[in-house]
Amino acid sequence: MKSDMRYIELNGVHRDEYLITFEDIDPNYRLSLTSALAYFQNSVAAFMTDRHIAAFDIRPEGFLWVISEISMKLSEKSPLWREKLVSEVKVSELTSTRAYFDFRLMRENGEEYASGTGIWSPVSLATGRPVQ
């Protein structure tokens, strides 16, 4: 993999802002779990895009990213439709085969709604196996 993970600079925190829209809510007008996870995935993808290692950057080299695990803690009350949220992602650990991303999703006032960790691994399109 030309974008060898051992030599990629993955420091810093990436922040995104989200406005909860109709497609992001459950029947009670609150942010759905699926949407919270989508914000996590989208923020990690933006983090990788800024560093030129997003899926569309590594696909021509014969690789893609696979999410192998996500764990997330949620506060009791989900944000409501039209609330603004801020996400933060950062790499907490990097190995030759995995990138561990920590995630936070906060309300505008800074109150944390969700936090968690996910594992992303580059996989060879030819073999379907993780890149070593």
Which role fits each region the language model picked out?
Residues 47-95:
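Hydrophobic beta-strand-centered segment that forms part of the acyl-chain substrate-binding groove
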